Amino acid sequence: MSMQDTLADMFTRIRNAQMAAKTSVSMPSSKMKSSIAAVLREEGYVGDFSVDEAVKPTLTIELKYYEGKPVIEQIKRASRPSLRQYKGTSALPKVEAGLGVAIISTSKGVMTDRAARAAGIGGEVICTVF
């Protein structure tokens, strides 16, 4: 049986690992997952990440905690394979009144909603993180 939504699997693995207080989480790698991990690292939600280019490429993400609680309080898939969500610049979501971020896939690459607004481009809303 093949996996239909690999990004939803990535977010679920992160949530489950944080609930179990793991220091890191591993998953099958892809370019999109690596781009999302890079954005999460830039925003301070996760520590470093690495891609092991073995027979099966594996992405390992180091999770961050603050005072014993996970830094990522909530991570939700917005656009899914059955219902894609594309937004223009003015319609990009503000997560938790600007305290969180939305990760957007644009023609210029994967970036946060703030960076997309600053660049004046819209795209597919992949997920929201708070």
Swiss-Prot record:
It comes from the Bacteria. Keywords: Ribonucleoprotein, Ribosomal protein, RNA-binding, rRNA-binding. Signal peptide: none annotated. It comes from Marinomonas sp. (strain MWYL1). Transmembrane segments: none annotated. Part of the 30S ribosomal subunit. Contacts proteins S5 and S12. Pfam families: Ribosomal_S8. SUPFAM superfamilies: Ribosomal protein S8 (SSF56047). The keyword Manganese does not apply. This is Small ribosomal subunit protein uS8. GO terms for molecular function: rRNA binding; structural constituent of ribosome. One of its GO terms (cellular component) is ribonucleoprotein complex. Belongs to the universal ribosomal protein uS8 family. The gene is rpsH. GO terms for biological process: translation. One of the primary rRNA binding proteins, it binds directly to 16S rRNA central domain where it helps coordinate assembly of the platform of the 30S subunit.
